[in-house]
């Protein structure tokens, strides 16, 4: 849960200070992630913060997983860069927007491919998955099982099945077992997270490439341990 020290610090920072602090920002390509102090702030759920948590887990970089309550959010909201979470505090510098955070950490942890073309393709995958994520929000937050099932049925044919078919094809055409390039990237973690979100609703045995992919990513050091210990939440 959020600490009073964190709230006071957030309240005392203006918008410019929250986004940049020239004294502590490091040159690109010369970063030592373990020397930074990271605090990730989000609700007690996977949602838009889970790919970020997977990045930390895979890179074996420590951070504070600051899970706030709705009451705490009322106080914190006007003090965030864009009025929503997740947000990441990096040694006093605050960054908003989940994909911007993924881009920052992916670059620091070596998970954005090996060249600018691969980086662009990785971000294309991230943005494509975000389109599906947006459509799934009502379903992920619905607690009534009957309504939840109906919501998923409505989305299945139009959005979920095309997603599964598309990424099954991508992996079948891949010679590396990865979505982009020849090593694990933010794209892999983004697709993995979406498949884990859909786990109870889809039959991955009908998609052998995706099933193998989920097993491979899920067994990676750091990822395996995080999946086992992460809090059980409804979204």
UniProtKB/Swiss-Prot annotation:
Limits of the GST N-terminal domain: 36-113
Residues that coordinate or bind glutathione: 42, 73, 77, 85, 97-98
Coiled coil spans: none
Family annotation (InterPro entries): Glutathione-S-Trfase_C-like, Glutathione-S-Trfase_C_sf, Glutathione_S-Trfase, Glutathione_S-Trfase_N, GST_C, GST_superfamily, Thioredoxin-like_sf
One example GO MF annotation: glutathione transferase activity
SUBUNIT field: Homodimer.
Protein name: Glutathione S-transferase 1
Source organism (scientific name): Onchocerca volvulus
